[in-house]
C-alpha cells in the first residue's frame, strides 16, 4: 500500500475519532480498510461532502451513526454528507429494507401523507436493480414519481448502492355500499370469533389444557421478563417529559398491534394510559415463546411496565422500550351496597354531541354492579332504544325507555291578571328591579325603579336603592354597575316596597320579562307582610316576541336600538325602566295596528297560535314509556316535537303531552326542569304547584349542580342543600316519590375529558361552555348515598334505593322493535306476479315453454309467493314500468338479476337462464347448459333453422340461490338504479302507490368520525394551551368518536309501512338533519335498526340511465336494440383502434376512457393484462375489479403465470356455484362453498375434500382461500350491459358520446384549455399531474374531464366558445364537428343563473353587457370572464340611447 493510501486510511480513522465512533468494534470488517478518497468543500454554501472508499456497503446502522456523528461534530462549520464508494456493490432485499426508513423519513416533512405511506411499508427488491413499492391510487404514484423518486434513488446512491430503478403497483379496494356492508358484517363476525376464542382459552385454562400452536394459554397473570415488585416506584405518564433510563409505569391497554418482522422476530406495540397521559410501549420478541405470549396481551388489561423512555424517530414521540411487562389488577369502582339503586336518568352517545360512553359499556357496568334495571333518557330522541334493548337482553337488565324532553307551555302569557282596561287610555307603571341573583327566594332586590306613563309621556318617576345587608358579589357589580357604596346605608327592603306599592297604585304594571320582575316583587311583598300585587300586568318581552317573531332576539337593548329608543346604561333599573316605558308604548300602538288589540284582556287572545311554540322557553322533563301504549305515545310525541314543534330543539307542548299521557311516566329532570327552577327562583308554594303535573321528582348529586354555584345562580353549597331539602319536602307534601338520579353522560370520572372536548368543539353555541362542566359519571349506590348524606341516612336510602326501584317496578317490560317482517299487502299480488311472469315467458318462449324455462319459473315462484315476497316484486315492477313508460331505462344492482321472475316482470334486463338462442318469430330456443358458454351475448350469430329469422341471444347463467338463498327464504333486496334526473319522480311515485303517510326516507345517523374527532382534540389542545403526546391524542380521539353529530337520509332508501299498521308501531318520524323545510320525512331510527321489520326500497340515482336517455334523444336509437357483441366496440376494451388514435395520443392503451366501470386507471391496467374480447370476459373484469383479493395476488398471478386464462378464473361469486355444479358437486354444497368464499371465510376441510374428489383444480381451491369479498354476477352483468351500450355510441356516434359525457358526468371544466385545443389541454393536465397528491379534489376531478377532452380533440373534433345565443343552460350542443359548451360550464356560474340567461335571451337580444348583467342576473365577475373568453364580441358595455 502506498503512503498516500495509508494517509487516506488514517484520515478516515481520524474522522471516526472526531465523530466519537473510534471504539465501534462491531463494524470493524467494514471500517478497517476504509479511506477518505476526497473532501469536496463548498465555501459559498457551507457544505462538506466526504467521498469514502470502503470494501463494501455499510450496514444501515453504521451509516446512520456516522451521518448523525458528522452532522453533530461539524454543525458549527458546515453541513455534511457522505458519498460511499464501495469496492463490492453486492446488495439484497434485506440491505435495501434496512436503509429504507433512513432514506424516506425526510419525505414526511415535505408530504406527511406520502411519508406515512412509505414509512408504513418495506420495498421489495427485484433483479437486476429495481425496487417496488405499493400505492393506493394514481395521484400517489404521480407524486412519488415526480417529487420523491429521484431523491430516493440518489439517497441510495450516496450510500454506495448501484443505480436503482423504482417501480410502483396499485392497490385497490371496492368502495361500493355492498362492500361496506360486507366489511361491517365481517368485522362483527371477527369480533364474535375473537370473543369465542377467548372463552375457549379461558375454558382450557380452567381445565389445565393446552392448545397446539398459536398463543400460549395463560396459567396466571400475563408476564414477560422479570417480575416487577409491588412496592417499586411507579411514575405517572403525565410526569414524563424527556428520555429516561429505567423507570416503571402502569396503565390500561387501549390498543395493541403485533408486527411480524422480516427477520422472523415479532414487534409488540401497545398503548397504555393511566389517565394522566398515554404512551406507546414497544417490545421485540426474543424467541418463539415471547412471540406466542404476545398474543395474550389484550386491550382492556391493566399492566405494569418497566423499561427505558426514548425518542422514537418513526413516531416522532417519546415511547417506552419495555424489558418487563406484568399484568396487574385494574382500577375498578365497586358497588358494595347490599341493596342496589337503579339509574333513571342516563344519556347515551345518541344525545347529540353531549354523551360519550357506549350503551354496551354503561349496561355492562350496571350489570357488574348488580343493578336490576337501567333507563335511557337521551335528549329528545329514542335512537338508542334498539341498541339498549339488545344490551338489556345481553346483560339481563330491565330497560326503561325514556327521553329527556324539551317541554313548553302552550303559549306564554303577554298579560297577567287580565282586566278589561282600554290600553290607549291607561296609566302604566313601568318598573325594573336589579337583584343579587336570579332567585326570588334566596336573592334580594338592590335597586327598584319605575316610571309612570300616560299617552306616551312620562308623568312620574320612582327610584330607590336597597341595602342587602351584605357585600355585593363581583358578578353583581360587573353586571349592574351598582357598587357597595351605592347601596350601603340605603333604606331597607320593607320600607322601599311599601313606598313602591303605594306609588304604583292600581296602574297597569309593565316589565321586560315580567315573570322575573313580578316574581321578585311578589315574593318580596310576602316576605315583608304585604299582599301580592293584583294589578294588571303587561310583559313587553312576550309582546315583542308576538309582534316581531322574525327578530333574531328580543332583548331590551336589541329592541331599543331597533326602534331608536335611548337606553343610557343597561342593567341599571332607572334607565331600563325609562327605556322600557317608551318601548311599551310603541308595542301597544303596534298591537292595535297589527292585530286590532284595544284592551288588556285581549292581549292573550293569540296565545298558543301559529309559531307561539317558538317563543316559549323550553324546560327539561323526563318522559318514560310505562306500557306498550305509552311507548307508541312516546313515539308520537317525539315525532310531533320534530315535525310540528321544532325550533332550535324538538319541543313538546304541555297540551300535547296531556293528550298522549296514557302509559307514560313523567319525571322532573335536572336543574333545567321547571320544578328545580321554581324552587330556586320562586319558593316552596310555586314548586308544590309545579309538582302536581309530575309522577315523580328527581334530585341529583350536588356536583351535578356545581355550574349553578360557579355562575352565581345559587349562592353556595349550603344554599344548594337547602334547595334540595325543600324539593324533598315538596315530595313529602304532594305524595310524589323523590328519586336520586345521576344525569349520567359517561361511565367513569376519567371519561369526563371526552365530553369536555365535544362541548368545547361547539364554542359559544353551547351554553355548557359558560362554566366548568359538572361531574356526571355513572355513580354506584355507595357513591350516591354519600352524595345525599346531608339528608340523613334513612332519607338518603329512601331516595337513592327505595324510590328508584319503586319507579322501576311501575314499568312493564317493553320491546321497542319488532321480531318479524311486516310487508305491505296488495290484494291479488301473488296472482299478478305469477300471471305477469307466465305472460312474458309465453310471449318470449312460446305457448309451450321449454322445460328449463318452466322449471326455473316454478322454482322461483314457489319461493317468492310461499314466503310472501310477491308484493315486493310487484312494487318493483310498478316502479320500473313507470320509469320505462316515461322514457328512462333502469339499471339493476345487486343480485336481483339472478331471479328469472324479476326478468319476466321487467324489473331487470339481466336474464339469468343458461346461454341460449331465442327466435323472436317462431319462439324456438336452443340452450347451452353445460358451462361451455359464459354468456348468451357471446354466441355467434345464427338464424332460426325453422323460420330463418335471426336468433336473439340471451342468458347469463346465474343461479337463483344467489338472490334469495338456498331455501329461497331470504328477504329480497331489490336495488334499482334510476336516472339521477328521474329519481325524485320515482321516489314521489311511492307516495302514489302507498299513500304519503306510509312512505318515509330511510333515516341515517351521522356520528363523529375519527378524522373529525382528531380536529376537536387538536383544537382543544391549542385553545387550552396544552401539549398532548401522540398516544394520548389517539386515546382522546377514540373517546370522542361514535357520538351522534347529525341525522340524514339514505340516498335512495324508501321505507314502506304496511297500511294495516302505522309508522309509530316501528319508529318515530323526523326531518333529516332537522331541516324542517325538507320534502321528505325520515325514520327516526337508523334504518339498520328496523331493516328486518319493514320493507326498504332502494331507489337509487345513477348517471348511466341519464346518459343512455340523452344518447337516445340525440340519436333516436333505442338502446335495447344496440348489439352487445359489436366487433368494433369489443376492440375498445383492448386497444385504441376503434377510436382511430394511437395510445400515445390519449395516454391509454385501451379506448375505455369515460366508459362506466372501465375508465379508471386500475381497470384499464386489468384490461391491458387480460385483453378481453367477449361480454362474459367483461363481466369477469367487472367482478374482479370490485372484489377484494380476487384480482390482486390471485387471478392476476394465475393469468400472468399462464396457469389459466381470463374466462377460467373466479370473477363473480355466482361463478363458484355454477362451476362446482358443472364439476359434479351437489348443489347445496356448491352453494355453501360459494357463500363461505364470498364472505371471506375460506374453505373447511370437508369442502376441500369434496372439491378434490370432484377433480376441482388445486389452483381453483387455493384461489378460493384467498378471497375476502366477491361481487354478484347479476350486478356485474347489469353494469357491463350499460357500459357496452355507452361504448357503442363512443365508437359509432362519438360527438353524441362526448356531448353526453360532458353534460351528465362532468362538473369541473377548464374551458380556456378545451377551446384552445389539444396542446393547451395537455399543458393543463401536466400542471395538475405535477402537483401529485397536493392537487385539490377539484383539480383531480378536472383531470378526468381533461383526459376525455384530450381524447375528443385527438379524434379530430373541437370545442367552440360559449355562445351567447347558441349555448344551452346546462347541456353541451353538437354543432358540426364541434361541441358548444353550456353556460353552467363557466366557472362559478350555477345552473339557475344559466337558465335565467336563456330565459332572458328568449325575450330579445341583449343590448349590452349591462343588459346581460341585469336581465340575466349575471355577476360582474362572470361578465368579465365571458368577455375575456371572447363570448361577448360586439356587445357594448352599456345601453346606448340614440336620438336619431
UniProtKB/Swiss-Prot annotation:
<dbReference type="Pfam" id="PF00929">
    <property type="entry name" value="RNase_T"/>
</dbReference>
<dbReference type="InterPro" id="IPR012340">
    <property type="entry name" value="NA-bd_OB-fold"/>
</dbReference>
<comment type="similarity">
    <text>Belongs to the DNA polymerase type-C family. PolC subfamily.</text>
</comment>
<protein>
    <recommendedName>
        <fullName>DNA polymerase III PolC-type</fullName>
        <ecNumber>2.7.7.7</ecNumber>
    </recommendedName>
</protein>
<dbReference type="InterPro" id="IPR003141">
    <property type="entry name" value="Pol/His_phosphatase_N"/>
</dbReference>
<dbReference type="GO" id="GO:0008408">
    <property type="term" value="F:3'-5' exonuclease activity"/>
</dbReference>
<keyword id="KW-0378">Hydrolase</keyword>
<dbReference type="Pfam" id="PF02811">
    <property type="entry name" value="PHP"/>
</dbReference>
<dbReference type="InterPro" id="IPR029460">
    <property type="entry name" value="DNAPol_HHH"/>
</dbReference>
<dbReference type="InterPro" id="IPR004365">
    <property type="entry name" value="NA-bd_OB_tRNA"/>
</dbReference>
<dbReference type="InterPro" id="IPR006054">
    <property type="entry name" value="DnaQ"/>
</dbReference>
<dbReference type="InterPro" id="IPR004805">
    <property type="entry name" value="DnaE2/DnaE/PolC"/>
</dbReference>
<keyword id="KW-0269">Exonuclease</keyword>
<dbReference type="InterPro" id="IPR006308">
    <property type="entry name" value="Pol_III_a_PolC-type_gram_pos"/>
</dbReference>
<dbReference type="GO" id="GO:0005737">
    <property type="term" value="C:cytoplasm"/>
</dbReference>
<dbReference type="InterPro" id="IPR012337">
    <property type="entry name" value="RNaseH-like_sf"/>
</dbReference>
<dbReference type="Pfam" id="PF01336">
    <property type="entry name" value="tRNA_anti-codon"/>
</dbReference>
<feature type="domain" description="Exonuclease">
    <location>
        <begin position="428"/>
        <end position="584"/>
    </location>
</feature>
<dbReference type="GO" id="GO:0003887">
    <property type="term" value="F:DNA-directed DNA polymerase activity"/>
</dbReference>
<keyword id="KW-0963">Cytoplasm</keyword>
<dbReference type="GO" id="GO:0003677">
    <property type="term" value="F:DNA binding"/>
</dbReference>
<dbReference type="Pfam" id="PF14480">
    <property type="entry name" value="DNA_pol3_a_NI"/>
</dbReference>
<comment type="function">
    <text>Required for replicative DNA synthesis. This DNA polymerase also exhibits 3' to 5' exonuclease activity.</text>
</comment>
<dbReference type="Pfam" id="PF17657">
    <property type="entry name" value="DNA_pol3_finger"/>
</dbReference>
<keyword id="KW-0235">DNA replication</keyword>
<dbReference type="InterPro" id="IPR004013">
    <property type="entry name" value="PHP_dom"/>
</dbReference>
<dbReference type="InterPro" id="IPR011708">
    <property type="entry name" value="DNA_pol3_alpha_NTPase_dom"/>
</dbReference>
<dbReference type="InterPro" id="IPR028112">
    <property type="entry name" value="DNA_PolC-type_N_I"/>
</dbReference>
<dbReference type="InterPro" id="IPR036397">
    <property type="entry name" value="RNaseH_sf"/>
</dbReference>
<dbReference type="InterPro" id="IPR044923">
    <property type="entry name" value="PolC_middle_finger_sf"/>
</dbReference>
<dbReference type="Pfam" id="PF11490">
    <property type="entry name" value="DNA_pol3_a_NII"/>
</dbReference>
<dbReference type="Pfam" id="PF07733">
    <property type="entry name" value="DNA_pol3_alpha"/>
</dbReference>
<keyword id="KW-0548">Nucleotidyltransferase</keyword>
<dbReference type="InterPro" id="IPR040982">
    <property type="entry name" value="DNA_pol3_finger"/>
</dbReference>
<keyword id="KW-0540">Nuclease</keyword>
<dbReference type="InterPro" id="IPR013520">
    <property type="entry name" value="Exonuclease_RNaseT/DNA_pol3"/>
</dbReference>
<dbReference type="GO" id="GO:0006261">
    <property type="term" value="P:DNA-templated DNA replication"/>
</dbReference>
<dbReference type="InterPro" id="IPR024754">
    <property type="entry name" value="DNA_PolC-like_N_II"/>
</dbReference>
<dbReference type="Pfam" id="PF14579">
    <property type="entry name" value="HHH_6"/>
</dbReference>
<keyword id="KW-0239">DNA-directed DNA polymerase</keyword>
<keyword id="KW-0808">Transferase</keyword>
Amino acid at each position: 500500500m502506498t503512503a498516500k493510501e495509508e494517509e487516506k486510511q488514517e484520515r478516515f480513522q481520524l474522522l471516526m475519532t472526531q465523530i466519537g465512533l473510534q471504539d465501534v468494534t462491531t463494524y470493524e470488517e467494514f471500517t478497517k480498510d476504509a479511506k477518505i478518497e476526497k473532501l469536496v468543500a463548498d465555501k459559498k454554501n457551507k457544505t462538506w461532502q466526504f467521498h469514502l472508499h470502503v470494501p463494501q456497503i455499510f450496514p444501515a446502522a453504521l451509516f446512520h451513526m456516522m451521518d448523525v456523528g458528522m452532522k453533530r461534530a461539524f454543525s458549527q462549520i458546515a453541513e455534511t454528507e457522505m458519498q460511499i464508494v464501495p469496492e463490492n456493490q453486492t446488495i439484497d432485499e434485506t440491505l435495501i429494507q434496512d436503509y429504507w426508513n433512513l432514506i424516506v423519513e425526510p419525505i414526511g416533512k415535505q408530504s406527511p401523507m406520502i411519508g406515512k405511506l412509505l414509512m408504513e411499508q418495506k420495498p421489495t427488491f427485484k433483479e437486476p436493480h429495481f425496487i417496488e413499492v405499493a400505492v393506493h391510487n394514481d395521484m400517489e404514484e404521480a407524486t412519488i414519481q415526480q417529487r420523491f423518486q429521484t431523491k430516493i434513488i440518489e439517497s441510495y446512491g450516496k450510500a454506495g448502492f448501484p443505480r436503482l430503478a423504482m417501480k410502483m403497483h396499485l392497490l385497490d379496494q371496492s368502495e361500493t355500499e355492498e362492500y361496506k356492508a360486507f366489511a361491517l358484517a365481517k368485522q362483527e363476525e371477527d369480533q364474535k370469533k375473537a370473543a369465542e376464542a377467548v372463552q375457549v382459552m379461558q375454558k382450557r385454562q380452567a381445565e389445565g389444557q393446552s392448545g397446539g400452536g398459536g398463543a400460549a394459554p395463560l396459567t396466571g397473570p400475563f408476564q414477560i421478563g422479570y417480575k416487577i415488585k409491588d412496592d417499586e416506584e411507579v411514575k405517572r405518564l403525565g410526569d414524563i417529559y424527556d428520555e429516561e433510563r429505567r423507570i416503571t409505569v402502569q396503565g390500561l391497554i387501549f390498543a395493541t398491534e403485533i408486527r411480524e418482522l422480516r427477520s422472523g422476530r415479532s414487534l409488540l406495540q401497545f398503548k397504555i394510559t393511566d389517565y394522566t397521559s398515554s404512551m406507546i410501549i414497544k417490545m421485540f420478541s426474543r424467541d418463539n415463546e415471547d412471540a406466542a405470549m404476545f398474543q395474550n396481551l389484550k386491550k382492556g388489561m391493566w399492566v405494569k411496565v418497566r423499561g427505558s423512555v426514548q425518542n422514537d424517530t418513526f413516531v416522532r414521540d417519546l415511547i417506552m422500550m419495555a424489558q418487563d411487562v406484568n399484568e396487574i389488577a385494574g382500577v375498578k369502582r365497586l358497588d358494595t351496597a347490599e341493596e342496589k339503586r337503579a339509574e333513571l336518568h342516563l344519556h347515551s352517545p345518541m344525545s347529540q354531541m353531549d354523551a360519550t360512553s357506549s350503551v354496551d359499556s354503561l349496561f355492562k357496568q350496571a350489570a357488574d354492579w348488580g343493578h336490576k334495571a337501567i333507563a335511557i333518557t337521551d335528549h329528545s330522541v329514542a335512537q338508542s332504544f334498539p341498541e339498549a334493548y339488545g344490551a338489556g337482553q345481553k346483560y339481563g337488565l330491565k330497560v326503561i325507555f325514556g327521553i329527556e324532553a324539551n317541554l313548553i307551555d302552550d303559549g306564554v302569557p303577554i298579560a297577567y291578571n287580565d282586566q278589561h282596561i282600554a290600553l290607549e287610555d291607561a296609566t302604566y307603571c313601568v318598573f325594573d328591579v336589579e337583584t343579587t341573583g336570579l332567585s326570588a327566594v334566596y336573592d334580594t332586590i338592590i335597586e327598584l325603579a319605575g316610571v309612570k306613563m300616560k299617552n306616551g309621556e312620562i308623568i312620574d318617576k320612582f327610584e330607590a336603592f336597597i341595602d342587602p345587608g351584605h357585600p355585593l358579589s363581583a358578578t353583581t357589580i360587573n353586571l349592574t354597575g351598582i357598587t357597595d357604596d351605592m347601596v350601603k346605608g340605603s333604606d331597607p327592603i320593607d320600607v322601599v316596597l311599601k313606598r313602591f306599592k303605594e306609588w304604583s297604585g292600581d296602574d297597569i304594571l309593565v316589565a321586560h320579562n315580567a315573570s322575573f320582575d313580578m316574581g321578585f316583587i311578589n315574593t318580596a311583598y310576602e316576605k315583608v307582610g304585604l299582599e301580592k300585587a293584583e294589578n294588571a300586568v303587561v310583559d313587553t318581552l312576550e309582546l315583542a316576541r308576538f309582534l316581531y317573531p322574525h327578530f333574531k332576539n328580543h332583548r331590551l337593548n336589541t329592541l331599543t336600538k331597533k326602534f331608536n329608543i335611548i337606553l343610557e346604561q343597561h342593567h341599571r333599573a332607572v334607565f331600563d325602566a325609562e327605556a322600557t316605558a317608551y318601548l311599551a308604548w310603541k308595542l301597544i300602538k303596534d298591537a292595535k295596528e297589527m292585530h286590532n288589540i284595544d284592551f288588556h284582556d285581549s292581549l292573550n287572545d293569540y296565545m298558543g297560535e301559529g309559531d307561539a311554540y317558538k317563543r316559549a322557553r323550553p324546560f327539561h322533563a323526563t318522559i318514560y314509556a310505562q306500557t306498550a301504549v305509552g311507548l307508541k305515545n312516546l313515539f308520537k310525541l317525539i315525532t310531533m316535537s320534530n315535525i310540528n314543534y321544532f325550533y332550535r330543539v324538538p319541543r313538546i307542548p304541555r297540551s300535547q303531552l296531556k293528550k298522549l299521557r296514557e302509559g307514560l311516566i313523567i319525571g322532573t329532570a335536572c336543574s333545567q326542569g321547571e320544578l328545580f327552577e321554581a324552587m330556586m327562583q320562586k319558593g316552596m308554594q310555586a314548586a308544590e304547584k309545579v309538582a302536581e303535573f309530575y309522577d315523580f321528582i328527581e334530585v341529583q348529586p350536588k356536583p351535578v349542580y356545581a355550574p349553578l354555584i360557579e355562575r352565581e345562580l345559587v349562592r353556595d353549597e349550603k344554599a344548594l342543600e337547602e334547595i334540595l331539602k325543600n324539593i324533598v319536602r315538596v315530595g313529602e307534601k304532594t305524595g310524589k316519590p323523590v328519586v336520586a338520579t345521576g344525569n349520567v353522560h359517561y361511565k367513569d370520572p376519567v371519561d369526563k375529558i371526552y365530553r369536555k372536548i365535544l362541548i368545547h368543539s361547539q364554542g359559544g353555541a353551547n351554553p355548557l361552555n359558560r362554566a366548568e362542566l359538572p361531574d356526571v359519571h355513572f355513580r354506584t349506590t355507595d357513591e350516591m348515598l354519600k352524595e345525599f348524606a346531608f339528608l340523613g341516612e334513612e332519607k338518603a336510602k329512601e331516595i337513592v334505593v327505595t324510590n328508584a326501584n319503586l319507579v322501576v317496578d311501575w314499568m312493564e317490560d317493553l320491546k321497542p322493535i319488532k321480531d318479524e317482517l311486516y310487508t305491505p299487502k296488495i290484494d291479488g299480488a301473488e296472482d299478478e306476479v305469477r300471471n305477469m311472469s307466465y305472460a312474458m315467458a309465453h310471449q318470449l318462449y312460446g305457448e309451450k315453454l321449454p322445460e328449463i324455462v318452466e322449471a326455473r319459473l316454478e322454482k322461483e315462484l314457489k319461493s317468492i309467493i310461499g314466503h310472501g315476497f310477491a308484493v315486493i316484486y310487484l312494487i318493483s315492477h310498478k316502479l320500473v314500468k313507470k320509469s320505462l313508460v316515461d322514457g328512462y331505462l333502469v339499471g339493476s344492482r345487486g343480485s336481483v338479476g339472478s331471479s328469472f321472475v324479476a326478468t319476466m316482470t321487467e324489473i331487470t334486463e339481466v336474464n339469468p337462464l343458461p346461454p341460449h338462442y331465442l327466435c323472436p318469430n317462431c319462439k324456438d330456443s336452443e340452450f347451452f347448459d353445460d358451462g361451455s358458454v359464459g354468456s348468451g351475448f357471446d354466441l355467434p350469430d345464427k338464424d332460426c333453422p325453422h323460420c330463418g329469422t335471426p336468433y336473439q341471444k340471451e342468458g347469463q347463467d346465474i343461479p337463483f340461490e344467489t338472490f334469495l338463498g338456498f331455501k329461497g327464504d331470504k328477504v329480497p333486496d331489490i336495488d334499482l338504479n334510476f336516472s339521477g334526473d328521474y329519481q325524485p319522480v320515482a321516489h314521489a311515485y311511492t307516495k302514489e302507490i302507498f299513500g304519503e303517510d306510509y312512505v318515509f326516507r330511510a333515516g341515517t345517523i351521522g356520528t363523529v368520525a375519527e378524522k373529525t374527532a382528531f380536529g376537536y382534540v387538536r383544537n382543544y389542545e391549542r385553545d387550552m394551551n396544552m401539549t398532548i403526546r401522540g398516544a394520548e391524542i389517539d386515546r382522546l380521539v377514540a373517546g370522542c368518536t361514535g357520538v351522534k353529530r347529525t341525522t340524514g337520509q339514505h340516498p335512495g332508501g324508501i321505507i314502506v309501512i304496511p297500511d294495516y299498521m302505522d309508522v309509530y308501531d316501528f319508529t318515530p318520524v323526523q326531518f333529516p338533519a332537522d331541516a324542517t323545510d325538507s320534502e321528505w320525512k325520515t325514520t327516526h331510527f337508523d334504518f339498520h335498526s328496523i331493516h328486518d321489520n319493514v320493507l326498504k326500497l332502494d331507489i337509487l340515482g345513477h348517471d348511466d340511465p341519464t346518459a343512455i336517455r340523452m344518447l337516445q334523444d340525440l340519436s333516436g336509437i333505442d338502446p335495447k336494440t344496440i348489439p352487445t357483441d359489436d366487433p368494433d366496440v369489443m376492440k375498445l376494451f383492448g386497444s385504441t383502434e376503434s377510436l382511430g388514435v394511437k395510445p400515445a395520443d390519449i395516454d391509454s392503451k385501451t379506448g375505455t376512457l369515460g366508459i362506466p366501470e372501465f375508465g379508471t386507471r386500475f381497470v384499464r391496467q386489468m384490461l391491458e393484462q387480460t385483453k378481453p374480447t367477449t361480454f362474459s370476459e367483461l363481466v369477469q373484469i367487472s367482478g374482479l375489479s370490485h372484489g377484494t383479493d380476487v384480482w390482486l395476488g390471485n387471478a392476476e398471478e394465475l393469468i400472468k403465470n399462464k396457469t389459466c386464462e381470463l374466462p377460467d378464473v373466479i370473477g363473480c361469486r355466482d361463478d363458484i356455484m355454477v362451476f362446482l355444479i358443472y364439476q359434479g358437486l351437489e348443489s347445496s354444497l356448491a352453494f355453501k362453498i360459494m357463500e363461505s368464499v364470498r364472505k371471506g371465510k375460506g374453505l373447511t376441510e370437508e369442502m376441500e375434500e369434496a372439491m378434490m374428489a370432484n377433480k376441482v383444480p388445486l389452483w381453483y381451491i387455493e384461489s378460493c382461500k384467498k378471497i375476502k369479498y366477491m361481487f354478484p354476477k347479476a350486478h356485474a352483468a347489469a353494469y357491463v350491459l350499460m357500459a357496452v351500450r355507452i361504448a357503442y355510441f363512443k365508437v359509432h356516434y362519438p360527438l353524441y358520446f362526448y356531448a353526453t359525457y360532458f353534460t351528465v358526468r362532468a362538473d369541473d371544466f377548464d374551458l380556456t384549455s378545451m377551446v384552445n385545443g389539444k396542446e393547451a389541454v395537455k399543458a393543463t393536465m401536466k400542471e395538475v399531474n405535477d402537483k401529485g397528491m397536493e392537487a385539490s379534489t377539484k383539480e383531480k376531478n378536472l383531470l378526468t374531464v381533461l383526459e376525455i377532452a384530450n381524447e375528443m380533440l385527438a379524434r379530430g373534433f373541437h370545442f367552440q366558445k360559449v355562445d351567447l345565443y347558441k349555448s344551452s343552460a346546462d347541456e353541451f350542443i353538437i354543432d358540426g364537428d364541434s361541441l358548444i359548451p353550456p353556460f353552467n360550464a363557466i366557472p362559478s356560474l350555477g345552473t339557475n343563473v344559466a337558465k335565467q340567461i336563456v330565459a332572458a335571451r328568449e325575450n330579445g337580444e341583449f343590448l349590452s353587457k349591462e343588459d346581460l348583467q341585469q336581465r340575466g342576473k349575471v355577476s360582474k365577475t362572470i361578465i368579465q370572464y365571458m368577455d375575456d373568453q371572447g363570448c361577448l364580441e360586439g356587445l357594448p358595455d352599456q345601453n346606448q340611447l340614440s336620438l336619431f
